[in-house]
Amino acid sequence: MMLPSVLQRRAIDHQPVLADEVRRLLAVRPGETIVDCTFGAGGHAKLLAADLNGNGRYIAIDRDPSVRPYFESFKRRYGSLQTRLLRGEFSLVLEQLATNGVEADAILLDLGVSSMQVDHPERGFSYATDVPLDMRMDRSAELTAADIVNDASERELADIFKRFGEERYARPIARRIVGRRPLTTSFELVDVVKRTTADEIGRAHV
């Protein structure tokens, strides 16, 4: 699949927030092997490829299949490098690379959702638009956010919110979700969180 020209430009022109810090800490030199565990739109890849100066290997990893056009654009621009895109969870891919004897001089991880997910409302990561609860990094996966919200127990939901979201009101939010189910859209989930948070804050000041 080819990127429309405007997306090609966005892929190449995307600038990471901590670009200078990443380059300074990794200190990439020509001839090295770089493993980018969260390739995304290729913003970090462009910076580090420039430091390789046409000599080296760049291994890109991402579980989101929609990154492929961005990788192909990157590959065309930096054709003198040895490049490879591996799809999957970076923890599993890194284990596979180690098993195959691949040694990296630098490994980069930029964790969290990216503009590739947030800028596409239909994927369900943004709360700015009322859309179905999806939130799958890999859209070929069967389990969606709606499945978890509607099928998990109250205790499981509270644990998810506490462990992965560091949510102060994890338990009351989980309790209200269970009482309001089914929830199918982002606005429904946002409403539950907002109402619960407001109630808990109000209760704390009584």
Model-derived features: where do they sit?
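S-adenosyl-L-methionine-dependent methyltransferase catalytic core, i.e., the SAM/SAH-binding region
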Residues: 1-203
